[in-house]
From Swiss-Prot:
Name this polypeptide is given: Small ribosomal subunit protein uS9
Database matches in Pfam families: Ribosomal_S9
InterPro entries on file: Ribosomal_Su5_D2-typ_SF (IPR020568), Ribosomal_uS9 (IPR000754), Ribosomal_uS9_archaeal (IPR019958), Ribosomal_uS9_CS (IPR020574), Ribsml_uS5_D2-typ_fold_subgr (IPR014721)
Gene assigned in the entry: rps9
Domain of life: Archaea
């Protein structure tokens, strides 16, 4: 078994790389502890794979480097990368089934992208108001 495992998670334009290694339960996002992440809802979302892992989370350290996108996209990308890394590190099919049952999007990148702007409009769907007079 190698010293560490790297996994990637994506959401919209956010890309997260999670590095998992044997450790003492430290979880860093861009070098800062995950507990210091400012938005509580997103912090809880990022901690879901760790909560599912339970007590075994004290055996590992996860360092996530995330860039691009906004807060929510980065949180989802981080969550996906962490879940994938945890599954590959422990190689436990029961754990994978538990994560998949909890939320499949933790293991599958969301492929939806922003729809491009169309001519004669302000965005993908909105159009200029039509005047008859």
């Amino acid at each position: 078994m190698s010293d560490y495992i790297i996994k990637v998670g994506k959401r919209k334009t956010a890309i997260a790389r999670a590095i998992i290694r044997k450790g003492s339960g430290k979880f860093l996002i861009n070098g800062y502890p995950i507990e210091l992440y400012p938005i509580e809802i997103l912090r809880e979302k990022m901690l879901e794979p760790i909560r599912i892992l339970g007590d075994r989370s004290k055996e590992i350290d996860i360092d996530v480097n995330v860039h691009g996108g906004g807060n929510t996209g980065q949180a989802d990308a981080t969550r996906t990368a962490m879940a994938k890394a945890i599954i590959e590190y422990f190689k436990d099919s029961d754990l994978e089934a538990e994560i998949r049952a909890y939320d499949r999007s933790m293991l599958v990148n969301d492929v939806r992208r922003k729809m491009p702007k169309k001519p004669m409009g302000y965005g993908a769907r909105a159009k200029r108001q039509k005047s008859y007079r």
